[in-house]
Structures are given as C-alpha cells and as structure tokens.
Amino acid sequence: MIKLRLKRFGKKKEASFRIVACNSTSRRDGRPLQELGFYNPRTKETRLDTEALRTRLTQGAQPTDVVRTLLEKGGLLEKTERPSIAIGKAKLEKEKLAKAKTKDEENDNSKVESEGNEAES
C-alpha cells in the first residue's frame, strides 16, 4: 500500500519535512517513491506538487493524518470529520456512571411494579 507521509530532514530541533509517497512498510526517512511537497512547521510554509498529489490520490495512496490536514488546507481534499480514536478516561467513567444510574432506575421501577402486582393479588 502506498502512503503519503512526512519525511523528516534538517538540523536537530529545526526539523522540516518533505511530503513523500512511499511504501507503507518502508522506514520514515528511507528512499521514497516520489517527493510531492515540502512543509516547514516553524514558518508554516507549505509547497505542494498538486498534479503529482492528485495522481497519487487517484491511484489509491492513503495520506496520514498530518498530510491529510495539509492537503485539506491546500484545497486538494475536502474537509472530513474524523472520529476521535482515543476517548479520555474521565469520559469513559462518566458514561459508565450514567449507564449504572439508568440500570438502577430501571431496577427500582421494576421492583415497585412487582410489589404493586403482589399487593393486588
């Protein structure tokens, strides 16, 4: 599978990145199939080879999350809402508490109904 991802270069603590097309199993800084652009996070400079990127995308190349956002800003991809993969522990605990409360309420309601049925008979 071909991936569109960032290849790091530059000095220590002054990183810049090239947007490259490479095999998904190759190393981060290994030899790419094709260089498609440039991104400097310090100056926010971005250069994209739009024709080559469109060609790779039509061939089925999958961009990484960071490259996807760069392509969305560059106008090559439509913005999409991606669901969060990781949910915080606090949010999970809140959901568990809410489920437990609803189960307790259901149990209380069923007890009241069963007591009412016993009193009638």
Curated annotation (Swiss-Prot):
Listed InterPro entries: Ribosomal_bS16, Ribosomal_bS16_CS, Ribosomal_bS16_dom_sf
Top-level taxon: Bacteria
Q: Does the keyword Ribosomal protein apply?
A: yes
Comp. bias intervals (Basic and acidic residues): 97-114
Biological process annotations from GO: translation
User: Which residue ranges does the record annotate as region Disordered?
Assistant: 97-121
Q: Which family does it belong to?
A: Belongs to the bacterial ribosomal protein bS16 family.
Cite the NCBIfam families for this sequence: S16 (TIGR00002)
Q: What is this protein called?
A: Small ribosomal subunit protein bS16
